[in-house]
């Protein structure tokens, strides 16, 4: 799955206007997370319960230095040595609208830099927004996190398409300052949410470092997942087109923090 943004520059945008249509070109980075997937096809069937709950299975992946056996555990060579097997390992996971929520981290359109409005906004229009629309229509909880505009003059407004979901009651907009981690976890427990699928910006900053971000949510009783095509990093000066920082961040997330989900896999399932 190629990342869908790299070096795609739009015309200058006023903060929070709708980004123009994006056309892919030869400068776009090719980063196929799933090229090494030689596993069998999984059943993409979506089932609907009597209560309207949708359930479906997705193939996810994570990287491990240690060999992972068929039971999902380690093979011990001795009391002090574990068999190694540097590789991606695949996990077929059951998701449902009852136990899975989507998180969109800081999808701002009022960054203090127009370039970031264009760069991250292009990703949102191409992948993040369509996925959230599909998730909401399927009955999934969609949670959008941002700063409280009462406390900040910028980095608060979310992109227009996501704001429309909030206005229509199809997504929740939560302010970071209102939701310390313990309160957020209690909310998830009350709503029966055990799985969190993360998207948003930036992958190497807020997505992992916020109190409700991936790194801080490890070990809190929730299964964590990340859709890298619905995110992008704060790159170095010379890597905006190649997305090298996002690639490295995705690897780190997939290695020790969350299982990765392919955008096309989950989008196609939810659109059924």
Task: Label the predicted regions.
Residues 105, 141-147:
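Short beta-strand segments at enzyme active-site cores
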Residues 17-28:
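Short, low-complexity, disordered segments immediately C-terminal to signal peptides
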């Amino acid at each position: 799955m190629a990342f869908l943004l790299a070096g795609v520059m739009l015309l200058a945008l006023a903060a929070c206007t709708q980004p123009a249509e994006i056309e892919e070109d030869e400068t776009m980075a090719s980063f196929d997370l799933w090229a090494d997937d030689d596993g069998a096809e999984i059943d993409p069937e979506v089932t609907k319960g009597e209560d309207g709950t949708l359930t479906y299975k997705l193939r996810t992946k994570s990287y491990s230095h240690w060999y992972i056996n068929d039971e999902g555990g380690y093979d011990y060579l001795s009391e002090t040595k574990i068999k190694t097997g540097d590789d991606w390992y695949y996990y077929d996971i059951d998701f449902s609208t009852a136990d899975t929520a989507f998180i969109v981290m800081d999808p701002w359109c009022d960054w203090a830099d127009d370039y970031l409005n264009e760069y991250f906004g292009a990703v949102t229009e191409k992948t993040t927004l369509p996925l959230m629309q599909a998730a909401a229509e399927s009955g999934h909880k969609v949670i959008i996190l941002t700063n409280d505009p009462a406390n900040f003059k910028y980095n608060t407004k979310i992109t227009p398409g996501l704001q429309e979901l909030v206005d229509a009651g199809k997504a929740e907009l939560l302010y970071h300052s209102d939701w310390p981690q313990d309160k957020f976890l209690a909310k998830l427990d009350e709503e029966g949410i055990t799985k969190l699928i993360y998207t948003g910006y930036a992958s190497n900053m807020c997505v992992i470092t916020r109190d409700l971000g991936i790194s801080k949510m490890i070990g809190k009783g929730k299964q964590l997942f990340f859709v890298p095509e619905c995110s992008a990093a704060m790159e170095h000066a010379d890597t905006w087109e190649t997305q090298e920082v996002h690639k490295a961040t995705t690897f780190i997330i997939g290695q020790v923090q969350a299982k990765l989900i392919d955008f096309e896999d989950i989008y196609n399932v939810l659109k059924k």
